Amino acid sequence: MTQEPGYTRLQITLHWAIAGLVLFNYIFGETMERAYDAVRQNVEPAGVGHYLHVVVGLAVLVLTLVRIGARFVLGVPEKGTTPGDKVAAGLQGLLYLLTLLVPALGMTAWGGGQAWAAGPHVLAANAIMLLALVHAVSALFHQYVLKDRLLLRMMRPR
């Protein structure tokens, strides 16, 4: 993986697309819960919200795989060496892991009919939201308190 000064337009687009899709699915996640309850009662789920949730979840999975591949092909900015930089790198790694794990658990629960995966799916989705909040607050702290322009790396392509 090469060290680059910033991110490419593709990497930035993938970052924000994945973030938006994750947020969308989190906000409208109750449609899946209602659909799951209906199926357990042998009733056809109402509406199309659950289908949309599945499609968006699959998109998150595919886009995350593309984003990980892009990291290796296109490179990423050099990582810092401070303890805070190491925490940030760990947080980023967890976000990547969760954006793969949540759709996989969702597919296992819904598509695979494995009810045990529904609880971990929801728990991991909640973890994504918590870590994304920490990630966003940290980026804003860098931009507006430290004034190191770190946030611009994910807004302006190299």
From Swiss-Prot:
Chain's role: Cytochrome b562 is an integral component of the cytochrome b-c1 complex in the cyclic electron transfer system of photosynthetic bacteria.
Family of this protein: Belongs to the cytochrome b561 family.
Record's protein name: Cytochrome b562
Cofactor(s), by name: heme b
Complexes and interactors: Homodimer.
Signal sequence extent: none
Membrane topology type: Multi-pass membrane protein
Textual note on the cofactor: Binds 2 heme b (iron-protoporphyrin IX) groups per molecule.
An annotated GO cellular component: plasma membrane
GO molecular function, one term: electron transfer activity
Compartments where located: Cell membrane
Residues involved in heme b 1 binding: H15, H135
InterPro entries per record: Cyt_b561_bac/Ni-Hgenase, Cytochrome_b561_oxidase, Di-haem_cyt_TM
Domain of life: Bacteria
